[in-house]
UniProtKB/Swiss-Prot annotation:
Residues in LCN-type CS-alpha/beta domain copies: 20-83
Comment, domains: Has the structural arrangement of an alpha-helix connected to antiparallel beta-sheets by disulfide bonds (CS-alpha/beta).
Entries under CDD domains matching the protein: neurotoxins_LC_scorpion
Annotated signal peptide: 1-19
Stated name of the protein: Toxin CsE9
Keyword check for Nucleus: no
Cellular component per GO, a single term: extracellular region
Function: Beta toxins bind voltage-independently at site-4 of sodium channels (Nav) and shift the voltage of activation toward more negative potentials thereby affecting sodium channel activation and promoting spontaneous and repetitive firing.
GO molecular function: sodium channel inhibitor activity; toxin activity
Taxonomy, superkingdom: Eukaryota
UniProt subcellular location: Secreted
Family membership: Belongs to the long (4 C-C) scorpion toxin superfamily. Sodium channel inhibitor family. Beta subfamily.
Disulphide bridges: C31-C82, C35-C58, C44-C63, C48-C65
Length: 84
């Protein structure tokens, strides 16, 4: 029982450490996902959750996500935006 609890705790911690926050980034087009402040929150949230994030919102005309897996391409700044 203690082993199961310890393994579960480790998996939760690993998931928390490997999660990243940032702007969704399209490597092929080399740009961040475009949105319109406030009205784009639903689309950003949906796109972020599709990529494995916990939630997303529109910030500086680009989709910002929280809790993305470490393998998801992100940008730390909004930069050049594009429609994906």
């Amino acid at each position: 029982m203690n082993s199961l609890l310890m393994i579960t705790t480790c998996l939760i911690l690993i998931g928390t450490v490997l999660a990243e926050d940032g702007y969704l980034f399209d490597k092929r087009k080399r740009c961040t996902l475009e949105c319109i402040d406030k009205t784009g929150d639903k689309n950003c949230d949906r796109n972020c959750k599709n990529e494995g994030g916990s939630f997303g919102k529109c910030s500086y005309f680009a989709c910002w996500c929280k809790g993305l897996p470490g393998i998801t391409p992100i940008s730390r700044t909004p930069g050049k935006t594009c429609k994906i």
